[in-house]
From Swiss-Prot:
Stated name of the protein: Anamorsin
Binding positions for [4Fe-4S] cluster per the UniProt entry: 275, 278, 286, 289
GO molecular function, one term: electron transfer activity
UniProt keyword Glycoprotein, yes or no: no
Superkingdom of origin organism: Eukaryota
GO cellular component term of the entry, any: mitochondrial intermembrane space
Subunit structure: Monomer. Interacts with ndor1. Interacts with chchd4.
Principal location: cytoplasm
Disulfide bonds: none
Gene expressing this chain: ciapin1
Alphabetized UniProt keyword annotations: 2Fe-2S, 4Fe-4S, Apoptosis, Cytoplasm, Iron, Iron-sulfur, Metal-binding, Mitochondrion, Nucleus
Keyword Metal-binding appears in the UniProt entry: yes
Compartment list: Cytoplasm; Nucleus; Mitochondrion intermembrane space
Known cofactor(s): [2Fe-2S] cluster; [4Fe-4S] cluster
Length: 313
């Protein structure tokens, strides 16, 4: 039988789990000794591992939780179970977990390696995961593993580990007491330096102060608007033996000049009258007349139409 003095102490509130493979007589004996160990102020709560998530225990309810330590228990504790244990443990509380492990397991195997179990305890919010013991299985226990879990490897053993919940609630926060920053005093200003860089109105009118006139910095040539041809690079578009071609990303205006030469100028032609009565007004104009809507005009008078009116007509 386990040395309960290393698992629990007097006055603690303890939860112990069991499953369908646990020995009923061993469970009763183990719980009885637990109650003696935590008496007179402590209590022992017995939970079926499959119902632990449904028990709805309050946060930080137990000083210690014992998982799989009852003789005959073959449970493999899921990450959800471990997270629930971390929730119901008090800050600083401990969990003792005992389960079957294998040295080398394939993906999809029901068992885990000792390293994987230690990692899951840490991911659940527990710390200081340490191994207490590791024992090989008896032939009868190996046969039970094959029947219950379907694992036929010869590298199965029983491992017991202990982990603790940190001395604070998971997700809790606390304000940091940072040292107050010292207020830097402004350095005194040297009045001699201020006077050196300060110009008064009298200084501006002083004949001894040589001030530059910004208008005198430019001559007449600088003020002339540049001709586009003067902005072109040397040899840009020149030479009768080659076709004029603008540079890539042209900025001198040659590209626009060549584009204008390619596009022929289109001057809209005056629309002729088909009936000769257009000048009389809308009353004498047909429905498709381009002069429809315009005032009457003298015969032979030149009237220019907007290209938009020609398209509408």
């Amino acid at each position: 039988m386990d040395d309960l003095g290393t698992l629990v102490s007097s006055g603690q509130k303890v939860a112990v789990t069991w499953d369908g493979s646990s020995s009923k007589d061993a469970l009763k004996e183990f719980v009885s000794k637990l109650q003696e160990a935590v008496a007179p102020q402590g209590t022992v709560s017995v939970e079926n591992i499959e119902r632990l998530l449904l028990s709805a225990h309050a946060d930080s309810s137990f000083d210690a939780v014992l998982l799989g330590v009852v003789q005959g228990t073959q449970s493999v504790h899921s990450s959800e179970i471990l997270a629930e244990v971390a929730r119901i443990l008090k800050p600083g509380g401990a969990v003792i977990i005992q389960e079957l492990v294998a040295a080398g397991v394939d993906k999809g195997s029901p068992l885990r390696t000792p390293e994987r179990l230690s990692s899951l305890l840490k991911l659940s919010g527990l710390t200081e995961a340490t191994q207490l013991l590791q024992e090989p299985l008896s032939p009868e226990q190996k046969q039970t593993v094959v029947e219950l879990l379907g694992y036929k490897g010869n590298d199965v053993s029983t491992i017991r580990m202990k982990a603790k919940k940190p001395n604070y609630e998971l997700g809790s926060s606390r304000q940091l007491s940072l040292p107050k920053s010292k207020i830097t005093e402004k350095s005194s200003v040297d009045q001699a330096t201020v006077k050196l860089w300060t110009l008064s109105a009298n200084d501006m009118n002083d004949e001894n102060v040589d001030l530059l006139d910004s208008d005198e910095l430019l001559d007449q040539e600088d003020l002339k608007k540049p001709v586009p041809s003067s902005l072109r690079a040397s040899g840009c578009g020149e030479g009768s033996e080659k076709k004029r071609k603008a540079c890539k990303n042209c900025t001198c205006g040659l590209a626009e000049e060549l584009e204008a030469e390619k596009t022929p100028s289109t001057v809209p032609k005056a629309a002729p009258s088909a009936c000769g009565n257009c000048y009389l007004g809308d009353a004498f104009r047909c429905a498709s007349c381009p002069y429809l809507g315009m005032p009457a005009f003298k015969p032979g008078e030149k009237v220019l139409l907007n290209p938009t009116q020609l398209q509408d007509a």
